[in-house]
């Protein structure tokens, strides 16, 4: 059914279905992307008995992993009054302690894990054909500061976990904004790659005044 998305849990030993949960939330993508399908593109995240699923129509659903019961559901377009991403939501949810992070709702969004309430949203992508990031975020320590590292359609950005403030940013060139790779943290360095734009290694440091500084080591 093209109007619904379905998540199924299977017994690993037998392959039999344990539970199935569905919600209304499907959409069609532009014709040139249709070959990749018009269904969920992100990878679900399982953590401490809870399953977090990002649906293609910019929704985030939290389910009980044992029963499949929906604990909460956020429709970002409805709640934030943002337009749907033309290619659908692609980012996989990132769980960190009491919060969930995802590139949805026209930017990078932090939610309360227990309730689904939005804490903040940042990195406004402007929506339309250039909106809806493809990359999934990571969290790590760079230059002594724990932060989220987020690759948008156009940039690689360090984001403060408490406030959502941008800590640093570098432009990442990619054909039609197809920045898909999840960044990799190596010490105080970040590796990433883009479609048609090459591979990059950046070093993140701080000045004597405490502001962040980026240096491209190679491309």
What is each stretch, according to the model?
Residues 1-219:
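Noncatalytic, solvent-exposed loop/strand surfaces
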